Amino acid sequence: MTFPLPPGARRLWFLEAFADGAPLHNNPAVFRLTGTVSVDALQRAADLVVARHPVLRTTFDEVDGEPVGRVGPVGAADVVVRTVPSASASASASASASADAADAAAEAFAAQAAREPFDLRTGPLFRIRLGRITPTDHVLVINTHHAVVDGTSLLVLCGEISALYADPARPLPDPGAPPDGVDDDPSRRVSDLDGAPDLLTLPTDRPRPRMRAFRGELRRHAVPDGLTARVDALARATRATRFVVLQAAYAATLGTTAGQDDIVVATLWSGRPGPEFAGVVGMFVNPVPLRVGIGGDPTFRELVARVRRSVAAGLGSAAVPFDRIVEAVGASRDPSHAPLCQAHLVMQDPPEVVFPGVRVDRMLPDTGTADVDLSLMVESGGAEMAVVTEHDMDLFDDATVDGFVGRLLSLVERACADPDGRLSALTAGTSVVAASVAGPAAAPAPSTVLEMIRFGADGLAAGELSYAELERRSAALASVLRAKGAGPEAWVAVDLPRGTDLVVAILGIWRAGAVYVPVEPLWPEPRRRAVTEAARVVLTEIPDLPEEFERVDPGITPDSLAYVFHTSGSTGRPKAVGVPHRAVAEMLARSTALVGLGAGDVVAAMVSPAFDISVWELVGPLTVGARVAAIPPEIVVDGPALARRLMAEAVTVVQVTPSVWAVLVAAGGVPDCVRVRVSIGEVLTPELAGSLGGAELWNTYGPTETTIWSTAERVHPGSRFGIGGPLDGVAAYLLNAGLRPVDDDVVGEVYLGGFPLARGYLGAPGEPRRRLLPVRRPFPGG
């Protein structure tokens, strides 16, 4: 006899093809039994439940390309008893050592039995494994495939096995017929889920694989005493249920951790529309996506109201098969993640068995798999809720999941105490200011950049220009510029390619007391015009410089502007970011010390002068007596030519974007002469970082508004890395939308303070107030 599969079983039939032999859909219940267990009684009870429920005798096949179920004849249940060796079974072993060894043996047997794969075509899809550690110590694993038994059915089976073990003649209620039919109209859910994000972007410990391997782990988490009662009290106060309160807290923790306001979490509907179906065994459960918006910084009470409406909408169409919803919504079918919902919240009583004269303790039924990124399972069988997580091990470490649950439980505690508290306050972390990046201490920086330039150094400063020639030419240019009206705070627009003349121009402008304002030759004409019209002088070439000239006093202070860079910003219009000498001097002193830049180094200048990071490579070397080697733009984009040029110039330090590093790697690798490799301006991927090994590699970060480098991290081969810690003297905060600190592993917005702050957006008086916050010691230790 064959029959068409119900939607849930049909979905698992197709998903099994992607599991690649992993026990992804095993559905075990695991127990530690202390006392004498009757194997005969267990076999008899199992035989009786197999006879009672045809689904336990079902296998799967395809007919005309469609999956079908086939019910087999009544027969003996698959019950196997195995002896479990214990490592400390000797008489000389201490009691504690023997107990530890028995526990380890029990865990190993439970894992092996829970993960034993099923074959949907050949069956059986229901089995019992009993591991005998000692005559009075056993592990019982009741295992089924999810395609035939869902979580509610597993509770039924465990209850029936318990009853029939104690009394095989005990009459049990007729299981009844399975629920009939499903709701095949997803239209209401489409309106609920229209525009929902495809992916929950929780920060991961490793990059998401292109194809899921379904490797997972279960973890049990302690719940504070009395929390269940407090949650129930909050549910009553907000006219909600325990599930709604926990769903609100779960969605809020997911959203604040991921930095997303729009969250979709799936819960599981039992597929049993009434109590008359309580004893039916089968696969009827259906994932129900619930969408929750946490934006606008609601109070927790307001969030509970949102979730209550979301749950009502979802459960009102709970009978619509999940696959139909995914199809109707047009959710992505990306093999790297589950469609539509990558987080689940499940509330369900745990399965139990009761055998006369036997103590029964539940064990975690860990199959070593996970079908979504993170599942939260709340068991409510005791006085306190039990919280268990299942996470994708390819994405998250145990500590990350433990931290997530800690934040979730903290939010629940805070919400119970203050349901009218704003989400930004209730989810605020305890992290304050990031620790500075470790490295050599920098000498106290002079108050202006000019005081740092090593004009008296021997050797070449830039290209073939010596330090002595650089000093004379920049001083002569300063005299010429001052005569043209370029003094303190006056802008000098510079339209020069990177090279020796550009270095002379920058220092000449500063020695005149003026402000360096670079112009990018490739800018659109309107933008170039806007910048040059604001300048007192426009420098398109180095003029003929006098042999004799009167040296000028720059007349600058640490707070005088050193340069102005133009960023397009969100409006597309150029914003003038003015940075004072103090910030540039401090940054160069700390960053050059951090990477050990010295007089023997040659630094490649490869970045467009329109970007502030060019200052580091054009001026930074001059503060330590090193040499600048300018690389023409056409060579920078030609990997083989770039490698040859770096070797010809004997370059030892390179600071470029990952895009340029990739050009070098593709051309055969970075020349060995480059001992320090700095990535800046773009995201450095682990793959590219691995290709840049064999030398000192730094990943750095810093917006124009905070002077080139704000944070840095030394990248070691094979290690996990980020943007690093702040440079000494930089205050770095990670804050939420309410300007409160966030914890580790939580997405927030970086706020930077300390010495490197720009003066502001020049000519835009409103911008500094919005983006440069005048906060004085906002947090303890800040």
What are these language model-derived features?
Residues 10-19, 28-36, 46-48, 62, ...:
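Adenylate-forming
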Residues 321, 346, 538-554, 584, ...:
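AMP-dependent adenylate-forming
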Residues 1-173, 204, 228-229, 257, ...:
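Carrier-protein-dependent adenylate-forming modules in NRPS/ANL systems
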Residues 623-626, 651-655, 665-722, 731, ...:
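Gly/Ser/Thr-rich phosphate-binding loop
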Residues 575-602, 612-652:
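Conserved AMP-binding/adenylation subdomain of ANL enzymes
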Residues 496-500, 514-530, 626-649, 655-660, ...:
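ATP-dependent adenylate-forming carboxylate-activation enzymes
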Residues 150-156, 352-357, 758-769:
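Cytochrome P450 core scaffold surrounding the K-helix E-X-X-R motif
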Residues 496-499, 520, 561, 597, ...:
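Conserved AMP-binding
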